[in-house]
Swiss-Prot record:
Disulfide bridges in this chain: none
GO molecular function: DNA topoisomerase type II (double strand cut, ATP-hydrolyzing) inhibitor activity; zinc ion binding
Protein name: DNA gyrase inhibitor YacG
Family: Belongs to the DNA gyrase inhibitor YacG family.
Superkingdom of this protein's organism: Bacteria
Cofactor note: Binds 1 zinc ion.
Organism for this UniProt entry: Chromobacterium violaceum (strain ATCC 12472 / DSM 30191 / JCM 1249 / CCUG 213 / NBRC 12614 / NCIMB 9131 / NCTC 9757 / MK)
Cofactor dependency: Zn(2+)
Length: 63
């Protein structure tokens, strides 16, 4: 029984990438795209949204 190989889009350039162990840089298509993505995180171009611990308009507590 053969399984079909899943194809995903590279997050950086949108090229098709086979999702399999032989795809060295998955989900990226290449080391270049992987490093571009890493650089975006390092320069804070990408951010994970965070919720404020205090209501809007209220001054945050100081320690």
């Amino acid at each position: 029984m053969s399984e079909s190989v899943r194809i995903v889009a590279c997050p950086t350039c949108k090229a098709e990438v086979r999702w399999e162990p032989q795809s060295r840089y998955r989900p990226f298509c290449s080391e270049r795209c992987r490093l571009i993505d890493l650089g975006q995180w390092a320069s804070e171009s990408y951010r994970v949204p965070a919720e404020e611990d205090h209501p809007p308009g209220e001054t945050p507590p100081t320690h």
